[in-house]
Amino acid sequence: MDKIAILTSGGDASGMNATIAYLTKYAIAKQLEVFYVKNGYYGLYHNHFITSKELDLTDFFFMGGTVIGSSRFKQFQDPSLRKQAVLNLKKRGINNLVVIGGDGSYMGAKALSELGLNCFCLPGTIDNDVNSSEFTIGFWTALEAIRVNVEAIYHTTKSHNRLAIIEVMGRDCSDLTIFGGLATNASFVVTSKNSLDLNGFEKAVRKVLQFQNYCVVLVSENIYGKNGLPSLEMVKEHFENNAIKCNLVSLGHTQRGFSPNSIELFQISLMAKHTIDLVVNNANSQVIGMKNNQAVNYDFNTAFNLPKADRTKLLNQVNTAII
């Protein structure tokens, strides 16, 4: 019986548990023996394995996070640690490793594949910054978390004629901010592609306030407080000092913790099935993603050289009020 191991790596994302469950379901149907690695590459190096018989995923399918744990293990860049990780797998007769994570996790998998291990990567990150997939596992649910939270903030913002500045996750990718702005009818959004200094920010807000008595702005994380721009706390203070009451909200890890929604689960099921089919057909290491609502696969080199999606039109659309 062929064997596979599954691990989750990097930041957690809604749908990781469902991905593990779908992979297990399709693998067992193909007579594969399934192992789980606890806590990502850290567990792979430290030999922390459990079998699918030791963990009932039924109760975790709809839960956010990852029941087998995840971690960021920078020491894995050490070649000797990677060799030990491969040895741990080989001792169990495991030749196929499925990695659920983002670009950093993919780099670890590519390094393992160069040691003769078959690695299959699925895009697990809320940031939607994996170029080999139109949408990543966790993105749609994080977007729903943004919609729910912003809707609640809208009510109090409108009631008190205020400005609300809402910081959104996404690391260096603006997709959650742009898609979130469109999904919530935000007044405008600020991303790395259109960052505003204090004067520019105030000008945009006052333009919105010319036709309504409130303003809701989504801002990507990792923009303010660096590269010569003020912190968001300073932005808030600036507006307060200029007679515009301002609420500053960071949505933080609420964007990671929701139960995966329907479109998330649908796409996960397609990618999981495609992954197991590749394993059964003895494919070499591959990166799996979504394109036009279908699961697709690429070799590592092709995947790493795919271009980023251009969001210029969407950014202009959401910022119609201030252009």
Curated annotation (Swiss-Prot):
Alphabetical UniProt keywords: ATP-binding, Cytoplasm, Glycolysis, Kinase, Magnesium, Metal-binding, Nucleotide-binding, Transferase
Known InterPro entries for this protein?
ATP_PFK (IPR022953), ATP_PFK_prok-type (IPR012003), Phosphofructokinase_dom (IPR000023), PKF_sf (IPR035966)
Highest taxon, organism lineage: Bacteria
Q: Which GO terms describe its molecular function?
A: 6-phosphofructokinase activity; ATP binding; metal ion binding
EC number(s) given by UniProt: 2.7.1.11
Where in the cell is the protein located?
Cytoplasm
Q: Which GO terms describe its cellular component?
A: cytoplasm
User: Catalytic residues per the record?
Assistant: 127 (proton acceptor)
Q: Which residues are listed for Mg(2+) binding in this entry? A: 103
GO biological processes: fructose 6-phosphate metabolic process
Q: Which Pfam families match?
A: PFK
User: What does the entry list as the binding residues for substrate?
Assistant: 125-127, 162, 169-171, 221, 253-256
Where is ATP annotated to bind? 11, 72-73, 102-105
Name of the top EC class for this enzyme: transferase
Cofactor(s) for this UniProt protein: Mg(2+)
Subunit architecture: Homotetramer.
The protein's matches in PANTHER family, at most eight in alphabetical order, are given as: ATP-DEPENDENT 6-PHOSPHOFRUCTOKINASE (PTHR13697:SF4), PHOSPHOFRUCTOKINASE (PTHR13697)
Protein family (similarity comment): Belongs to the phosphofructokinase type A (PFKA) family.
Purpose of the protein: Catalyzes the phosphorylation of D-fructose 6-phosphate to fructose 1,6-bisphosphate by ATP, the first committing step of glycolysis.
What this protein is called in its record is Probable ATP-dependent 6-phosphofructokinase
- Give the originating organism: Mycoplasma genitalium (strain ATCC 33530 / DSM 19775 / NCTC 10195 / G37) (Mycoplasmoides genitalium)
Gene of this entry: pfkA
